[in-house]
UniProtKB/Swiss-Prot annotation:
Domain of life: Eukaryota
Predominant location: cytoplasm
Gene Ontology biological process terms in this record: symbiont-mediated hemolysis of host erythrocyte
Organism of provenance: Aspergillus terreus (strain NIH 2624 / FGSC A1156)
Protein name as catalogued: Terrelysin
Keyword Cytoplasm in record: yes
Length: 141
């Protein structure tokens, strides 16, 4: 498979407790593959079995001759953290990566990807607990 259109999503669990899991992953174009071996294809079911432990990192990779478009939901137990969506198909003038429906109880940071047409590259997603406004106000006194 042509490796010119690829994305590698690094999800870091910075929560003090619990695991982050992936659900409802879907790839419209392209193919998921193992981070260790791009020739080893993975299914959406394989991606949905990924468990990222507290203070750990999980990696989801996809590529395709004409790029890929996909999405996945991140969960903390039964609570949805957010949805991740990307699109780096070759017919688009630019790349897109977005965090959708982020839960206010989590701080979700996204960095590293290329908005220019071509490979999305490495995307870094850091998930931590959001600071509560009341706790921040009390600490400021």
């Amino acid at each position: 498979m042509d490796d010119s259109q690829w994305v590698s999503i690094h999800i870091r669990d910075r929560l003090a407790q619990g695991n982050i899991t992936i659900r409802e992953s879907f790839l419209y174009e392209g193919q998921f593959h193992s981070p260790e071996d791009e020739k080893k294809a993975l299914t959406e079911d394989d991606i949905d079995q990924l468990i990222i432990p507290s203070e750990g990192i999980g990696e989801v990779c996809a590529r395709g001759r004409r790029g890929s478009e996909g999405w996945m939901d991140l969960f903390d137990g039964e609570k949805k953290i957010c949805e991740l969506h990307w699109d780096n198909r070759t017919k688009r003038p630019s790349n897109e990566f977005e965090v959708i429906d982020g839960d206010k109880d989590y701080k979700i940071e996204c960095s590293g990807w290329s908005p220019q047409a071509g490979p999305l590259g490495h995307v870094f997603i850091d998930i931590s607990a959001a600071k509560k406004k009341a706790a921040a106000a009390a600490a400021a006194k």
